[in-house]
Every structure is written in structure tokens, then in C-alpha cells.
């Protein structure tokens, strides 16, 4: 039996990872160079709003009919800045993001459109983010209720060795955001998201599963700044071995990864012509493990990702914990 916490895909919140950086103190030539460079990176090199890696396992699987509560604790730490060629920018500092994602999912027992099950869910997140440099200390950071994600339309199909899901959702800017503030938690703009998840059971006994989850983000203009973030393509994936023990919890172990690509230009009054040509890219590889208990119906999971070969963004690692319970 597959872990249910990874049967909830697309649940995410929008976090403006790199808020505006006002009032940096000028501490001589070195400090000026650092501040200008970091401000440029922070304004031009932000990522998409989807928390990468969270849907890497069992991406096409629909939960069983009824209600499921899912919680995911996602930690991202980045201590390198990459330019558009993938070279490390000589800046010392860190960008840390911590997210607590609370999702309530409902799945219908009825079938339609060739055996599809309809479902819907909402994700209410809490977040904390910090941007710190060795020269200036804490530059910006915020914590509190973040942007919430609502998915009113999900269709899921299941065949003998294939599971597929199609989703539409939108990100509402419910998190705190003010142009120029250094304690933002929300993104300050709406995002429409189309996504799909697939799980293919490679072997006849269904002990090996390959999963992939794709999302395309359509961003609107940011409130108060006039900045229109570029659209984003996200990809999570995994290859996992399932051990369905008869009198013990089932175990899933495998490799996992994620990618993210900016597909269109970021534009706005504060964006330079040079910055409109830049496109961020994120890559990561790691592993996952999940444990599922049949009574009560509880699932627990862990994932770790190490990023590499990023461009025009920060680079680091991610640690992710998850759990779910079906009512």
C-alpha cells in the first residue's frame, strides 16, 4: 500500500524568497560592492512559488475516498549564489526557508469520465524565511501565515500498472506582503497552476514505481512593485522500491530529484534589460523513505535533496518530513 502523504500533490504556498533589501549600511568599498551585488541577485533571481521535491513520490496516486489530513515540514537552506552561467558569485551569506504545510483533502467515492475520481483540497501554510550576510547580519526575514493554495479540480485515474492525476489550483496572496518591506511572508501576487502526476509500476508485482509530477506556474503582477515574475516549469520525480510486509508497516525506499526552470522573462519598472534575459534553473538529487501503517491509516515520510548546477538563483539543500492520516 502506498503512503498517503505523498498522494497529495500540488499543495504549496507562495513565498517571496528574496524580498526587497532597503537601507543597507555602506561600510566602505567592500560593503558597497557586496550590498549592490546581493540586492541585484535578490530582486532578479527569485524562484517559482512551488516548494520543490514535495510531490516526488507516488505522484499519480489518488487517496482513498473520504477525508485525509496531510502535514509537510519543508526546510530549504542555500548558501551559494549562482550567476546565469552557473558560476558561484563571491558572496558570503545564506537564505533559509522553513514551511509547515497543512492540507485537508476530500476524495469522492463516485467515478466519472472513464473511471476517474474527483477530489479537491486546500493547503494552509505557515512559513519562516531569513536572508543573512556575514557583513550585514540579518538583512531580511519574516514569519507567519503564508500564501494559501486551493485546488478545486482534481481528476485521478487508476489502471493496473498506471495511475494519473490532472489538477488545477490557484495560489492566493494571503501572506503578509508590502513593497519594500523586509519581513514579507507572502509573494504579493496570484498564481494559477496546471499540474499532472503520473506513477508507473515498472514490474508486474508492482514493487518498483517510477513517479513524475509536473507543474506550470502562471504568475500575475506583484502588488505595489509592478513586477511581473516570469512563468515557471517544475518537475519532481522518483524511482522507489516498495516492500509490502504482511504483518508490519509497508516500507518504500528510493532515489528522488527535482528541477525548476524559468520559461519567460521577469518584467517591471525595477527590472533592467539585462535581468529580463536571465532565466533561473534549479536541479537536485537525493533520496526518500516512507512508512505506511494500516491500522490506524497513518503514513510517515522523509526526503533529502542536494542541489547542483543551478543558474541565476541560490543553491543549497532541502530536508523534508511528511505525515498523513485518513479519517
Enumerate the language-model features and the residues they cover.
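Residues that define the transmembrane beta-barrel architecture of outer-membrane proteins
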Residues: 65, 94-102, 116, 139-149, ...
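Long, hydrophobic/aromatic-enriched structural stretches that serve as scaffold segments
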Residues: 95-155
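Surface-exposed strand-loop-strand hairpins of Gram-negative outer-membrane beta-barrel proteins
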Residues: 46-48, 76-99, 134-144
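Transmembrane beta-barrel strands of outer-membrane/channel proteins
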Residues: 69-77, 120-128, 166-174, 212-216, ...
